[in-house]
A protein has these predicted regions:
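Histidine-centered active-site microenvironments of extracellular/periplasmic hydrolases
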Residues: 2-13, 107-110, 116-126, 139-189
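Short linear sequence elements within intrinsically disordered, low-complexity coil regions
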Residues: 20-22, 119, 128
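A generic "alpha-helical surface" signal
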Residues: 72-79, 121-128, 132
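Beta-strand elements within well-structured catalytic alpha/beta cores of enzymes
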Residues: 81, 95-100, 127-130, 134, ...
């Protein structure tokens, strides 16, 4: 029942506010605010028909809100994070903003305005978009008076997928940096 509150989600686990999706590449494809679905899924979406810029698609078919566009997810999440920061302006109380970026994780789907900007293929373009997203949040912190009293932690959970090897061959782009290996390897990459 899409009208029922979501149990055991971020709000039930201590967050004051939540906006997002369950994950970018698994259904249901709809926005969730606090503990409610904003747009009830009314169609079945098969994103496997669309090809990512690089690698495998990694999207599961499933229920979606009308006119759901997976390509707009990163920018919409960024807009909402900036809006939330702006809503805190003038408040003299600490806050915690958790912003789990969907990029540059698969599916590799850089927005059109970032395509061709990196010289390192679709993944590089998605990294440029990720940098832009992080920059928007940092600019919002600065603009709203939080820049000098805020700790920003930017981290990653693993190294690149196996399709990093063609990226090395095609663009001489080593997304694992100086580390050895890739995701699921025994090495640190």
């Amino acid at each position: 029942d899409w009208n029922r509150p979501i149990e055991n989600g971020p709000i039930a686990n201590g967050f004051d506010y939540y906006f997002g999706t369950g994950t970018i590449n698994f259904p249901p494809y709809t926005w969730i605010e606090n503990n409610h679905v904003l747009d009830i899924p009314v169609e079945m979406l098969n994103l496997r028909e669309t090809k990512p810029g690089e690698g495998s698609w990694e999207c599961r078919p499933g229920p979606a809100a009308k006119d759901w566009n997976i390509n707009l997810v990163p920018e919409r999440l960024t807009e909402k994070a900036v809006e939330w920061i702006e809503s805190r302006k003038g408040r003299d109380e600490p806050f915690f903003l958790y912003f789990p970026l969907p990029s540059p994780h698969a599916p590799i789907i850089p927005d059109e305005k970032f395509r061709g900007t990196s010289g390192a293929g679709a993944y590089g373009d998605y990294v440029v978009q990720t940098d832009w997203m992080a920059g928007q949040i940092i600019e919002a912190l600065e603009r709203n008076g939080f820049g000098k009293n805020t700790i920003v932690i930017f981290s990653s959970d693993n190294g690149p997928e196996t399709y990093a090897y063609p990226r090395i061959e095609n663009y001489q782009h080593y997304s694992m940096g100086v580390l050895r290996g890739l995701k699921r390897d025994l090495w640190e990459g």
